[in-house]
Amino acid sequence: MAPNLRKSHPLLKTINNSLIDLPTPSNISAWWNFGSLLGICLATQILTGLLLAAHYTADTTLAFSSVAHTCRNVQYGWLIRNLHANGASFFFICIYLHIGRGLYYGSYLYKETWNTGIILLLTLMATAFVGYVLPWGQMSFWGATVITNLFSAIPYIGQTLVEWAWGGFSVDNPTLTRFFTLHFLLPFMIAGLTLIHLTFLHESGSNNPLGIVANSDKIPFHPYYSTKDILGFILLLLPLTALALFSPNLLGDPENFTPANPLVTPPHIKPEWYFLFAYAILRSIPNKLGGVLALAASVLILFLIPLLHKSKQRTMTFRPLSQLLFWTLVANLTILTWIGSQPVEHPFIIIGQLASLTYFTILLILFPLIGTLENKMLNH
């Protein structure tokens, strides 16, 4: 009998073991769809990004008009740009839901998978930031100025570091060209990190909603979850195309329709919606270095999550107190996102400070505390 090429070919067998014959828990819910959705987001962003890069000019005098040219004169250029800009939003929606799933169901106990995931998140955030600068509108320019300036808070080397990043004494042409270089490079780095992320995941196999060992009841990935994933793709791509076609500027800032002008500061400098929670935490501390440290901590705190797991149960499925705390955290992040979009004035300042404090309190103190309490309740 001839050997099955799918199982014997060096390349095909890797694909087979990852996407076809992969043993998968039989009870994973739609919350497990977001990994593959992130893969589709990445593929879409790389494809649309390549097409945009073919028409883009990374020069301060030409960048803004080259983007306008793409939208006006290139076949379906407007659609490619709108898909790319809104695709970023969907990328972040998926990654935040994916992280939320990981938190709720204790997936972070696969430490290597979790840590590579956080590195992926940081790389994605860097990619989105440098990409936002490229159209060279007002918010692009001032966003770049404000965020890169944060590095000057680093003692002793800060100012040198910022000028080195800028390639001069302010955000200018060298900054734009290097940001374009980085924006082109980083998505491929994300693709590479994704393979590492999956390699670690397939070492242990997927977690499941019950948080129990599911080896005795696993099913092949294909056709069960391949079909389920395709349904997920459709449900992701439908709202993306709807947004890109009907309301492409809904999530953007009108300020970015004005070409960058170093002499005019926009009244409210704010990032895209997916960074607002971190921006609110940054602004809630009246000290520059303190704010920068809080900003970094708001994301890097995720590295500590596996160490703070005190419960005897892996998931929150049967832990109502932890569930309540989890949804409080979600509400808290929603409040932070809202505060980040508001001007720095009363009552937004105090709300932002309280929400920032609550964010760190829930993750660092209350989650381990409630976990320990629930363990005690199990004994009675």
UniProtKB/Swiss-Prot annotation:
It comes from the Eukaryota. One of its GO terms (cellular component) is mitochondrial inner membrane. It is found in: Mitochondrion inner membrane. Keywords: Electron transport, Heme, Iron, Membrane, Metal-binding, Mitochondrion, Mitochondrion inner membrane, Respiratory chain, Transmembrane, Transmembrane helix, Transport, Ubiquinone. Binds 2 heme b groups non-covalently. Heme b b562 binds at H84, H183. This is Cytochrome b. It is a multi-pass membrane protein. The lineage of its organism: Eukaryota, Metazoa, Chordata, Craniata, Vertebrata. Signal peptide: none annotated. GO terms for molecular function: metal ion binding; ubiquinol-cytochrome-c reductase activity. SUPFAM superfamilies: a domain/subunit of cytochrome bc1 complex (Ubiquinol-cytochrome c reductase), Transmembrane di-heme cytochromes. It holds the Pfam family Cytochrome_B. The cytochrome bc1 complex contains 11 subunits: 3 respiratory subunits (MT-CYB, CYC1 and UQCRFS1), 2 core proteins (UQCRC1 and UQCRC2) and 6 low-molecular weight proteins (UQCRH/QCR6, UQCRB/QCR7, UQCRQ/QCR8, UQCR10/QCR9, UQCR11/QCR10 and a cleavage product of UQCRFS1). This cytochrome bc1 complex then forms a dimer. A ubiquinone binds at H202. Its cofactor is heme b. GO terms for biological process: mitochondrial electron transport, ubiquinol to cytochrome c. The keyword Aminoacyl-tRNA synthetase does not apply. Heme 1 (or BL or b562) is low-potential and absorbs at about 562 nm, and heme 2 (or BH or b566) is high-potential and absorbs at about 566 nm. The chain crosses the membrane at residues 34-54, 78-99, 114-134, 179-199, 227-247, 289-309, 321-341, 348-368. Belongs to the cytochrome b family. Heme b b566 binds at H98, H197. PROSITE patterns: CYTB_CTER, CYTB_NTER. Component of the ubiquinol-cytochrome c reductase complex (complex III or cytochrome b-c1 complex) that is part of the mitochondrial respiratory chain. The b-c1 complex mediates electron transfer from ubiquinol to cytochrome c. Contributes to the generation of a proton gradient across the mitochondrial membrane that is then used for ATP synthesis.
